[in-house]
């Protein structure tokens, strides 16, 4: 339970028997304990035992879903006593028989706690062992469950008692209250055992919106939501630009602080400290870029595309772009030419000529094609494409979008074919483009555009760097630094 970030402070123990678990509770620093016991003789013993412990309450009643009176079957082995008649239990344990039956009060747990003046907020853990009547008791404890973080419940795979709930029934009920079963043990028989349920753990990504730009945030969002879905956890994160643009589950201004931390330093599966580790990481705050080879995200393609559907004024902008593209006489090829901060390392500048070579081949099949250019330095690249009908953001109605990059991103998702940069921005747009059947990207060491599958490729190609190839794929700033470095090395070796 501790691995889920849960450290109980108050316990409700239903089916207390002799209350021997008190030592375990005290050892773990739990002060507030409420015992509920239906057997009058056992309840009396509990009251005597804990009479000098004011933080222990003993309630005599059979926990159920209704107030009333019911028959309680006391067996020769009193731990098997139950509201329900023996069934499979009689076959498995023939020496244990019903010794006698008595009438007891049945009551909802919620009502019993109110009667005794127990603050629901003081109870965050429930232990329940009432011989097949667990679901009845849970149905009467729905208010109490609101504050509970974990439950340990006796479960049945067969009806040991007539009409008793099976483990699947318990799972279904508690799932409706946002609990999941995380551990099950059956040490004595395959027909029954104990299960630990915890409130669906949260996992977070506090780096989302803080670590990199829009596309980095987009991949962080994809990761935390796909990981949470795989593990059946609840994702939490801050607000980010995608909250305005997409049909996402929005972030919160102050997400909860989670006790566990995990930093992802790898880019591929083989380097990842997360994707190859089957160990669950509940109550964990993840940080990293999570730009894995995208087959990792493929099983969740439908969910991702649903979350990343444009909404509001961004959906309207998409409609404007769609109308512009549909008005052209042929297919529209959306291209992304990243300049600005590119020109060093793996973020090389792909020359316009690589795109022109590819377009000239494509135009043989589609002579009426048009080219939409998305670029952070449009004036520097536009003239190279003068031989083609060109489209840019300037051809669209003016807008006052809060996120000025959104028009180009949306346009990239609408292309009939798509040529990207070695950029997570246009790669992410390719993942959302459902129209195109042809995607190409610049491959540095081959100095050309090559086809790729957006849902089965590395987000960034890292095999070569701009400095390895030459100045034509470097920025002026990077070239200057490179020349300075070479000159400095030359002096050093000359001096030596």
PLM region descriptions:
Residues 1-202:
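Phosphate/nucleotide-binding beta-alpha loop and adjacent structural elements of enzyme active sites
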Residues 35-39, 233-243:
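A short beta-strand-loop structural module common to alpha/beta enzyme folds
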Residues 41-45, 160, 242-247, 343, ...:
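Short, charged/polar "capping" segments at the starts of alpha-helices
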Residues 56-57, 389-391, 464:
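Short, conserved active-site loop motifs that form the nucleotide-linked donor/cofactor pocket
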Residues 204, 240-368, 467-479:
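Secretory-pathway luminal glycosyltransferase catalytic domains
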Residues 209-219, 344:
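A short, glycine/small-residue-rich beta-strand->loop->alpha-helix junction that serves as a flexible
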Residues 364-457:
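Donor-binding and catalytic core of enzymes assembling or modifying cell-surface/extracellular glycoconjugates
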Residues 427-496:
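Nucleotide-sugar donor-binding patch of glycosyltransferase catalytic domains
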